[in-house]
Every structure is written in C-alpha cells, then in structure tokens.
Amino acid sequence: LQNQIEQNAVGHAYLFTGPRGTGKTTVARIFARAVNCERPVNGSPCGECAVCRALSEGSLDILEIDAASNNGVNEMRDLREKVQYPPVSGKYKVYIVDEVHMLTDSAFNALLKTLEEPPAHAIFILATTEPHKIPATILSRCMRLDFKLIPEEDLETHLKRILDGMGKEYEEEAVSA
C-alpha cells in the first residue's frame, strides 16, 4: 500500500481480509488519509498538512459503512448516489465498508454496479472476516490483502524494542504474553 501511494498508483477497490483484531479497519483508515495527504512520508500520512488535519477532524472524504447494520440494497444505492460527488478537501473520496460479507445479495449487486464504473476520485476498501461469502464478481474487482494475527512472541519483542527505544522503564511481566 505504501508503494502504491509513493508511486501514485492506487487502485479503486481493495479487499482487506483476516480474523478480527488484525487491523483491517485501522489500516483502511490510515490508507484513506495517506492517499489524500499533500506530503506523504514513505507512503504514510504526514498528519500535519491541511488535508490530514481536515481528515482527522472528521472530513466527509472518508465514509465508513458498517455492513453488519447497514446491509440492504437501499444503503448501497445511497452509496452509488454519493460516489458521484467529488471529495471536499482531498484527492480521493474513500469508502470503507466494514463487515462487507453481511451485505444482502441485492446490496452486493448494487455495490457491483459501483465497482464496475467507479469515478476516478473514488476508492473502496471492503473489510471482512469471511471472504468466502463475497461474490466472485466483487472479488474479481478488488486487490486482496490478507491480514494475519501476529504471534505473541513477536508482539512482545516489538513492544520491548519500542519501549527501549523511547527510554521507558517497564515490568517484564507487563509486556510478556
């Protein structure tokens, strides 16, 4: 994802898959800010430019939809209408659809129409724990990224490295698995 931002070659649809708690939605939010950042640093948002500030304050250029509670065709038709409007402050309007596997068949069909002919300013990030429930017609239009759980030992090592680098004291038991 960082390389795509650095090379200004982002796609229009992504599918983030993996177990709960692996960072799919968090990465989607960071990516949404990074693609709109005026001065990205190594493919990450700078957090300081006007666009980054606007996005962190809740800009309309990043829209999150929880498909678990908004899973009907009307919500996807509403999305199809909204997608025509250009972004307010950034280069892209990013639509994050969390738990996309919860959409109804009719809603998937409405989403498919949007993915088939997306405006140049729109990016869709679909997140799911159950990719096998996504229709093949949707899957074929997305770049898929699989998220995996990080082993506890790796988390412990990384956390210790960060704390040591910051010069922070810690109890061994507090960072152990």
How would you describe each model-predicted region?
Residues 170-177:
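Amphipathic alpha-helical segments of the small helical/lid subdomains adjacent to P-loop NTPase cores
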Residues 1-144, 154, 160, 164, ...:
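P-loop/Walker A NTP-binding region and its immediately flanking N-terminal helices
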